[in-house]
């Protein structure tokens, strides 16, 4: 189907839509199901090799090597007559893309464990790891409608090869790109057990990532370190033995972990092959840092009644720093920065019970509930020193990240109201063209938060011989939901 008033003689003899509504958003669903073809073929190779060797007494060596290789082909064909935004396809659309990627991981580790005087256990591990990622993509597309001969889905049938094609409304394109990334690290972990009652753990990691090396200016490799410490105390070992108590453990941990910035060349300038121009240099990335999360956690684990019943209670507090994002500068440029501080803290509780009804029947049930609160403690400061507001979302509402607010706060435009609380209308005498008066149009009214502070769940597993039935009921308490459908219904008075 083409424009019913102008017609399209090139589609004579071709399959077309039979559809009453000629609208850019409406297509016959059977047409879409059968004349919009998308083929995807993927081949994947996975390989894992592990080598273990005993060097001397309690010292062991292990190395692992993993490879993940993927090739993929994506072919997309849209037949002429598909209605799109602002036009209809008079020739059809064609896309063909080939990609391949590989991920390689290798590590080497030495471990040593021993027990002294039948009271102290020591476990130590040191090692190094290396990972590498590579991907390449080549694609050919007729980017809107460039097929000179309708529904001939081959790369030769495009506006470039047929410059006099009156039906070509956009150019075709060929694209090829590749990406490489690597990271390497040195790490060490240690665990000490005292009298089978107290266990102390610690770890350290020194990491190099390719994304940071562009900022070294030839002065070596830039690295970052992460670390953690933990303690576990078996309290029941310090108490008189009780038959109903199997284990009572207190645990605590503290850690600093991080993620590198995206692996892209931040000072990259683009070259236009059609006219030979070079884009302006983007703003500099000042003092790039990894995104880091500092976490503290403590809790109790309890096992009772021959390990049939157990529960644990956990308190956690974590702070995310140096989030990577792009901000808009005063002159409208997009600048990469590390900024912000978001704190999350909360409580988690879970319990489970196992009942062996008889030799064939068994029932296990579990319940969990968690409460979480977060606060945005810091955001990026503009050149004037004012906090920078990050917002996202459709025109109906925005999710704003404002200093002092919470992650997921929803803001909307509000209506101006008169002294009686009624919404003001821009022209009360002409109701046909009248529209409500907005208070500001800058999404300044906070209406709630989209995240639920409380989550919970109840699971049950019934086992009879070799047959198992499992079901889960979960839920969220709190949080706001925005309905764009309801807004459209209000528009039509429904």
Where are the regions that the model predicts?
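Short loop/turn motifs that connect adjacent beta-strands in outer-membrane beta-barrel proteins
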Residues: 5, 56-58, 115-122, 197, ...
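Small-side-chain secondary-structure face that scaffolds active or pore-lining regions
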Residues: 42-44, 50-147, 191, 209-224, ...
